[in-house]
């Protein structure tokens, strides 16, 4: 039996993690975010009602689940309050269900200003960040000058620290980026107005999780973005600023690494990517447009159109290696309905003619790569809303089997629609 289950993306994000976390939390006591910030966009559809969460864990919609934001998450007080209000306006009691680590770094206005100024300065070489201050906040954390949730317990000291760090960043904004300085008093006033709300939710997350482990409680760890956006293992520098892989669970929550029991990798039936960066299987033809339209591939956070392409088994195998995946959840299978043929990338042809079956790490080394495809028959029957494996077309079953063969990982869950009811659980991670 797996008490501590990790759910993470195996591609470039947007795989459908939010729905699956929400579904599996029916049995969980706690749901923990361990990395990223409000650059995530987790979409849940419950009884036809759509909810988009950016910062608060997806378990917040469950009455008997406690949601936790761990120390690996960079926390925007403004974004958190906005999201809390949106949920509370719908009658969802967030403050009674949400806990914070006091070690969460804070994202403040100057982080956002730096993020925007840097992207503007990069011009055509822009990374394609969400412009929400995620990277600059992680920079401050590593540089040991960042402000954290726990600093709000001593408001006078917080004000002094804020003044010092803002002098540093405003100097960059004005003198290097030729941008406007951020007003110190406004930042201080905005944070102080909600400081007591934030500190009232603080808990020792590592200790809480250890006690939960000893009691045998079920805990779900919710990843954001995807493996191929990991700061170390992704398509650097076109990556996010945190560890999106399973290793981030221990460092971003305080759970001992030996206590992770099952790692569920969410894999979309095709590939998508938002923003710049390598994407070998990207489609620029009518099939790419079909995938975008049928899959409603527009970012939940930015609204940007996602780039679309065929499933890249080479890249997914890298995710399998890094995360030691226990099983897959295959999402958006129904988007492929109606295609005469479907393709899977099984290797890369390098510019010098060599054929390889592993991914490069640096983005520059992806240039000139051509995907090697395996083509399979498509299916005309609908898979949308199918709730039994036996109800899937044989061609769809063959596609699923081929994914398992190419990756060495079983497909334990199949999603055939956006609602939590449109799901087949072939093997429950909490029972694995």
UniProtKB/Swiss-Prot annotation:
GO terms for molecular function: adenylosuccinate synthase activity; GTP binding; magnesium ion binding. Its cofactor is Mg(2+). InterPro entries: Adenylosuccin_syn_GTP-bd (IPR018220), Adenylosuccin_syn_Lys_AS (IPR033128), Adenylosuccinate_synth_dom1 (IPR042109), Adenylosuccinate_synth_dom2 (IPR042110), Adenylosuccinate_synth_dom3 (IPR042111), Adenylosuccinate_synthetase (IPR001114), P-loop_NTPase (IPR027417). Pathway: Purine metabolism; AMP biosynthesis via de novo pathway; AMP from IMP: step 1/2. IMP binds at residues 14-17, 39-42, 130, 144, 225, 240, 304. CDD domains: AdSS. Coiled coil: none annotated. Mg(2+) binds at residues 14, 41. GO terms for cellular component: cytoplasm. Keywords: Cytoplasm, GTP-binding, Ligase, Magnesium, Metal-binding, Nucleotide-binding, Purine biosynthesis. Gene3D superfamilies: Adenylosuccinate Synthetase, subunit A, domain 1, Adenylosuccinate Synthetase, subunit A, domain 2, Adenylosuccinate Synthetase, subunit A, domain 3. The keyword Disulfide bond does not apply. It holds the Pfam family Adenylsucc_synt. The active site is at residues 14, 42. Binds 1 Mg(2+) ion per subunit. It is found in: Cytoplasm. Its main location: cytoplasm. GO terms for biological process: 'de novo' AMP biosynthetic process; IMP metabolic process. Its EC number is 6.3.4.4. GTP binds at residues 13-19, 41-43, 306, 332-334, 415-417. HAMAP family: Adenylosucc_synth (MF_00011). Belongs to the adenylosuccinate synthetase family. Plays an important role in the de novo pathway of purine nucleotide biosynthesis. Catalyzes the first committed step in the biosynthesis of AMP from IMP. Homodimer. This is Adenylosuccinate synthetase. It comes from Klebsiella pneumoniae subsp. pneumoniae (strain ATCC 700721 / MGH 78578).
